[in-house]
Amino acid sequence: MTTKQPTRFEAVIGIETHVQLNSRTKAFCRCAYEYGAEPNTRVCPTCMGHPGTLPVLNSAVVKKGIAIGTALGAKIRRTSKFDRKQYFYPDLPKGYQISQFDEPLCYDGSIDVVLPVEDGGEVKRVGITRAHLEEDAGKLTHAKGEDGKKYSYADFNRAGVALLEIVTEPDLRTGREVAAYGSELRRIVRFLDACDGDMSRGSMRNDVNVSIRPVGRERFGTKVEVKNMNSFNAMARAIDYEIARQEELIRSGRGDEIVQETRTWDEAAQKTVAMRKKEGLADYRYFPEPDIPKLRLSEEFISNVVASMPELPSMVRARYAALGLPPADVQVLVEDKELVTYFDAALSSSAKPSAKQVANWLTGDIMAHLKNSKMENVSQLPLSPEALGEFCAMIDAGEISGKIGKDLLPELLEKGGSAKKLVADRGLSQVSDPREIEALVDGVLEANAGQLEQYRAGKTKLKGFFVGACLKASGGRANPSLVDRILQAKLDGVPIDVA
C-alpha cells in the first residue's frame, strides 16, 4: 500500500548569522585584528588558550551587542553569563569556544523586512529568538605542499575576535525572503558601525536551517543546515536548491535520506553537498565559563548605549517617505549609509534644493558614475554634497535645464567645483525671458512653414518636432516648459500667457 504524497510543500527556514563586531581588539584579550595580516601575527597566550591566562571581557563588544539587540527590538538581559562550548577542531586553539548558552545578552526581538516584489512586496516580521556574544575560531586553509601532499594550514589571527550570533525564529519560507532578511540585517549593523557586513571576508556569515513540510501541517520536517554562502544571491540559490532536493527525495519515496546534517553550498556546481552529521546541544557539553564573572548591566549603562545609537534604516525610510521620495529612490539611498549622509548633506546645503531633485540625480546619473568608475562609495567623489545641492537648486529654479545639467555633471563628478561658476564660464544659463523665447519660437515657425501648415491641417504630432527645433536653436538653453507654452499658444493662434 502506497502513501499518497501531499500536493504541495512549504519550506520552514531559520537563519543563524555570525556578525563580526568591529571592535579595535578581540573579545577577551588585547590583540588587534586585521583582515589579511600575516598568519598568526595577531595572537597572544590568552586567545591561544595557553595555561595560566585569563580572559577579560572587552566592554566595547558589549556595547555593540546592546546596540544591535536594541535595533532588532530585542530585550537586553541585565544579568547574563558566558559558557564554554566544547568541540574539537583544528582551528579552535583552546579546545572550546567562549559563548553564551542559556543566558544570551539579547532575546525576544523582531525585524521588519520588505519582501521582494516576487514575494508580494509586503513587509514581513521575522522573529529574533536570541543574539548572544561569543568568540570566533581561527581559519583553516587547505592546499598542496611542495611535496604534492595535501595540508591544512591554521591561521589563528581570527581566533578570539568578537561575534554576535543572531538567531531567527523559523519564520522564513523562500530563498528570496532569507536574502531580504540578510540584506536588512546587514544595513542595520552597518548603520550602527558595528560590522562592515563584508560577506566575502567573513565579517558576516550565515548558516541557514532548512526543512520542508506539507502545507497546513504544524510539525516541522527534518532540519538541514546549509553553510558557506558568500553573498545573498548565493544564499537564495542554495536555499532554493535545498528545498527542491528535499522535496524530490520525499516525492520519490526516499524521505528517510533527509537527515540532520550540515551541507555546504558548492558555488561551481550550484548545489549543496554533505559535510558532516549535525551535532546536537549535548555534543557540545556546555558549562559555565569559570574564568569570566557574570555580566551585570546597569540601567544607566544600557541607556547610554541606546542614547548614542545613530538613525536606523527603518527611521531613514520613514523620513524619506515623508519627503515624498518614490519608494525606488528610498530603497537605493538606504542601501548605503554613506549615501544617506551625502544625500542629507546635499539637502541641507545653503542652496536648499528639493529632495526629489537631489534623489533623482543621486540615484541615477551619480550612482551610474560610481559603478563605472569602480568607486566604493560617494565619499570618494570630487563633487561635494554642497556642490550637488547648488547644482540641483539651479535646475529647480530654472537657471539651467535638465539637459544642460546632464552635459555639466560629468565634469563636476570628475573635477568637483561649483556648478554656478561652470555655467557662467560656459555661458549656459537657461533662457527664461518670455520675449527671447517668443522670438526663438517665431524664428523656428518661420523657418519651417511647411511643417506648420501640416500641423494646422491636423498633423499635431509635429509639435514635438517644433519643440526640439526650438531647444536646438537655443543650444539647449531655452526653458523647456516656457518653450512648450509659448509654442502651443502660437500654434493655436491664441494670446500668449506666460504668467
Curated annotation (Swiss-Prot):
The domain of life is: Eukaryota
Q: GO MF terms on file?
A: ATP binding; glutaminyl-tRNA synthase (glutamine-hydrolyzing) activity
The name this protein goes by in its record: Glutamyl-tRNA(Gln) amidotransferase subunit B, chloroplastic/mitochondrial
Its source organism is Ostreococcus lucimarinus (strain CCE9901)
Sorted UniProt keywords: ATP-binding, Chloroplast, Ligase, Mitochondrion, Nucleotide-binding, Plastid, Protein biosynthesis
Please list the reactions this protein catalyses: L-glutamyl-tRNA(Gln) + L-glutamine + ATP + H2O = L-glutaminyl-tRNA(Gln) + L-glutamate + ADP + phosphate + H(+)
Q: Which family does it belong to?
A: Belongs to the GatB/GatE family. GatB subfamily.
Q: Which SUPFAM superfamilies match?
A: GatB/YqeY motif (SSF89095), Glutamine synthetase/guanido kinase (SSF55931)
Q: Does the keyword Transmembrane helix apply?
A: no
Give a GO biological-process term.
mitochondrial translation
Please give the coiled-coil regions recorded for this protein. Answer: none
Signal peptide residues on this chain, from the entry's feature table: none
Role according to the record:
Allows the formation of correctly charged Gln-tRNA(Gln) through the transamidation of misacylated Glu-tRNA(Gln) in chloroplasts and mitochondria. The reaction takes place in the presence of glutamine and ATP through an activated gamma-phospho-Glu-tRNA(Gln).
Transmembrane stretches, start-end = none
Q: Please give the Pfam families that the UniProt record associates with this protein.
A: GatB_N (PF02934), GatB_Yqey (PF02637)
- Spell out the InterPro entries in the cross-references: Asn/Gln-tRNA_amidoTrfase_suB/E, Asn/Gln-tRNA_Trfase_suB/E_cat, Asn/Gln_amidotransferase, Asn/Gln_tRNA_amidoTrase-B-like, GatB, GatB_Yqey_C_2, Gln-tRNA_amidoTrfase_suB_CS, Gln_synth/guanido_kin_cat_dom
Q: How does it assemble?
A: Subunit of the heterotrimeric GatCAB amidotransferase (AdT) complex, composed of A, B and C subunits.
Spell out the GO cellular component terms annotated for this protein, sorted alphabetically and separated by semicolons.
chloroplast; glutamyl-tRNA(Gln) amidotransferase complex; mitochondrion
Query: Which EC numbers characterise this protein's activity in its record?
Result: 6.3.5.-
Tell me what else is known: This protein may be expected to contain an N-terminal transit peptide but none has been predicted.
Entry's localization field: Mitochondrion; Plastid, Chloroplast
PROSITE patterns from the entry?
Answer: GATB (PS01234)
